[in-house]
Curated annotation (Swiss-Prot):
Its main location: nucleus. Keywords: DNA-binding, Metal-binding, Nucleus, Repeat, Repressor, Transcription, Transcription regulation, Ubl conjugation, Zinc, Zinc-finger. The gene is creA. It comes from Aspergillus aculeatus. Pfam families: zf-C2H2 (PF00096). This is DNA-binding protein creA. PROSITE patterns: ZINC_FINGER_C2H2_1, ZINC_FINGER_C2H2_2. Belongs to the creA/MIG C2H2-type zinc-finger protein family. Interacts with creB. Residues 1-74, 272-337, 352-431 are annotated as: Disordered. GO terms for molecular function: RNA polymerase II cis-regulatory region sequence-specific DNA binding; zinc ion binding. The keyword DNA-binding applies. Transcription regulator component of the regulatory network controlling carbon source utilization through ubiquitination and deubiquitination involving creA, creB, creC, creD and acrB. Represses the transcription of the alcR, alcA and aldA genes by binding to a GC-rich region in their promoter. Also plays a role in response to carbon starvation and the control of extracellular proteases activity. It is found in: Nucleus.
Length: 431
């Protein structure tokens, strides 16, 4: 029969010590079944050679496990759970089981910014591999969260409070059964998370890092006002300031936030707006003084806003006697008369500035009707270079004989003028 022949060949391959002439190799297979255990009683009862040969594999794979379980069942279980009826061989197993009832998780992850805790040390070990593997997607997400939390923790631990005492360390117990991660300050990150460390340091060194993080936590409302005013000043300064008008703009940037519509309006409300600017500076400096000495705002270089009194070309005690180079006010009316005629007319034709020009309080010290010749401004404004010459002084036309004869009817003023013009020694030569 072909099937028994194939079964005999297969049994010979599995059991080379058996006699190949035997037609029923079930006899060597039955001791194996009986020795391995009672898990496969059907193989011992089977009379088919194919079934007996194939049934050799399951006892080899399954026979050892029930034996070990029986051995473990025989061990004593002295450690019983007080909350349930379970008992354990070792004290560690009982302690780990009791934590499932109480919810205690003493094993905390020491990675900067990670707040997870575990009741078993092997769970903490498995969790720490997430931080140690930079290629994991969970690791990347956890690193971003850890960087933000580490920055906040570093801010709170690095800065002292207003009383001068250091803040207490975070209340995390350091007791754990497996030394997996580093124990130390949250500012120190492991070498594998250099990007987190760089982000953390960058957020610490940034001038507004404390304002944004502390404002998000809602601890101090004054920090919101400080950050808002600082951002507004910086935005306005970056829009208007340049290398050419940095000196001029630093003196007038207090009024550049859209509060005053025009320069002429500022000319009328000059004293009032300047007093408001000082009140604004005082309130802002008061908020700065209330902040901690280690804050980035107090250590940052001072902006041109705070050098208002030093860089201002116009002193505060002379609001009406503004010099001509001041960027805040236009020159007074008396100085406008020195301008050329076309510029003089263009200034007075401006409808918005004409009624708002400040007028001098005292009498005019200069009258254009007193000048008979061309002014210096007219000479310098001529396009032709040959015409830019000073005129020759107009000397009274007096003949030499009249100058030599003082008694010919000239007055003393004329003779004195002639003597001064001619040199004063012509009369002496004549006599």
């Amino acid at each position: 029969m072909p099937p028994p022949a194939s079964s005999v060949d297969f049994s010979n391959l599995l059991n080379p010590q058996s006699n190949p002439t035997e037609s029923t190799p079930s006899s060597p297979a039955t001791p194996v079944d009986s020795s391995k255990g009672p898990s496969t009683p059907s193989s011992a009862q089977s009379t088919s050679s194919m079934a007996s040969s194939v049934s050799l594999l399951p006892p080899l794979m399954k026979g050892s496990r029930p034996a070990t379980e029986e051995v473990r069942q025989d061990l004593p279980r002295p450690y019983k759970c007080p909350l349930c009826d379970r008992a354990f061989h070792r004290l560690e197993h009982q302690t780990r089981h009791i934590r499932t009832h109480t919810g205690e998780k003493p094993h905390a992850c020491q990675f900067p910014g990670c707040t997870k805790r575990f009741s078993r040390s092997d769970e903490l070990t498995r969790h720490s591999r997430i931080h140690n593997n930079p290629n994991s997607r969970r690791s990347n997400k956890a690193q971003h969260l850890a960087a933000a939390a580490a920055a906040a923790a570093g801010q709170e631990n690095a800065m002292p409070n207003n009383a001068g005492a250091l803040m207490p360390p975070p209340s995390k117990p350091m007791t754990r059964s497996a030394p997996v991660s580093q124990v130390g300050s949250p500012d120190i990150s492991p070498p594998h998370s250099f990007s987190n460390y760089a982000n953390h340091m960058r957020s610490n060194l940034g001038p507004y890092a404390r304002n944004t993080e502390r404002a998000s936590s809602g601890m101090d409302i004054n920090l919101l006002a400080t950050a808002a005013s600082q951002v507004e000043r910086d935005d306005h300064f970056s829009f208007h300031a340049g290398p050419r008008n940095h000196h001029l703009f630093s003196s007038s940037r207090h009024h550049g936030s859209g509060r005053l519509p025009s320069l002429s309006a500022y000319a009328i409300t000059h004293n009032m707006s300047r007093s408001h600017s000082h009140e604004e500076d005082d309130s802002y400096s008061h908020r700065v003084k209330r902040s901690r000495p280690n804050s980035p705002n107090s250590t940052a270089p001072s902006s041109p806003t705070f050098s208002h009194d030093l860089l201002s070309p116009t002193p505060d005690h002379t609001p009406l006697a503004t010099p001509a180079h001041s960027p805040r006010l236009r020159p007074l009316g008396s100085s406008d008369l020195h301008l050329p005629s076309i510029r003089h007319l263009s200034l007075h034709h401006t409808p918005a500035l004409a009624p708002m020009e400040p007028q001098p309080e005292g009498p005019s010290y200069y009258s254009p009707s007193q000048s008979h010749g061309p002014s210096i401004t007219d000479i310098m404004s001529k396009p032709d270079g040959t015409q830019r010459k000073l005129p020759v002084p107009q000397v009274p036309k007096v003949a030499v004989q009249d100058m030599l004869n003082p008694g010919s009817g000239f007055s003393s003023v004329t003779s004195s003028t002639a003597n001064s013009v001619a040199g004063g020694d012509l009369a002496d030569r004549a006599f």
